[in-house]
């Protein structure tokens, strides 16, 4: 079954890593939500917290699973926390994927802040062969949530 998935991540630090994951998803004919152009994101931030919350809420509509892409600063992101809370409130499947070892545009990797979201499956993109297995991970998260 095709799923529409919301990808949650710390924008500034992990956008290039998130794009690797997202592109692997959409090249397999899947739908992704939760991506925004850097200029659009800066404009959204200038509009304030309510505008950001409304944008996140709109992006979450019609999704069945939220995938939290975890890098070095993800655990301290208030917006990632908000996305996890909203996903739990609406009964979406949740899982975490460590993206810290995916190289950024400069060829650098980073550390991982921890395993979030707590209480859900957590995978390592490189070691657990994310490109080949993410579809199965997402299906499991959806089924675990009764979706």
Regions found by a protein language model. Give the residues of each.
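Residues at the C-termini of beta-strands that transition into short coil/loop
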Residues: 34-39, 98-100, 126
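Anion (oxyanion) recognition and catalysis
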Residues: 88
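Conserved beta-strand-loop-alpha-helix hinge of the TIR/SEFIR fold
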Residues: 59-85, 96-103
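C-terminal interaction surface of TIR/SEFIR-family domains
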Residues: 4-6, 20, 48, 103-147
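Conserved N-terminal substructure of TIR/SEFIR domains
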Residues: 1-62, 142-147
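Generic recognition of short, well-ordered alpha-helical segments
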Residues: 16-20, 78-82, 108
């Amino acid at each position: 079954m095709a799923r529409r998935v919301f990808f949650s991540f710390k924008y500034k630090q992990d956008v290039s890593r998130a794009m690797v994951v997202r592109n692997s998803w959409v090249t397999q004919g899947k739908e992704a939500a939760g991506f925004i152009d850097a200029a659009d994101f800066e404009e959204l931030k200038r509009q304030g917290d309510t505008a950001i919350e409304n944008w996140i809420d709109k992006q979450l509509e019609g999704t069945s699973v939220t995938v939290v892409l975890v890098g070095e600063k993800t655990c301290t992101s208030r917006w990632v926390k908000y996305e996890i809370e909203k996903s739990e409130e609406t009964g979406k499947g949740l899982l975490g994927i460590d993206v810290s070892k995916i190289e950024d545009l400069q060829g650098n990797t980073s550390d991982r802040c921890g395993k979030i979201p707590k209480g859900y499956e957590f995978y390592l993109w490189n070691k657990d062969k994310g490109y080949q297995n993410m579809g199965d991970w997402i299906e499991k998260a959806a089924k675990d949530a009764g979706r």
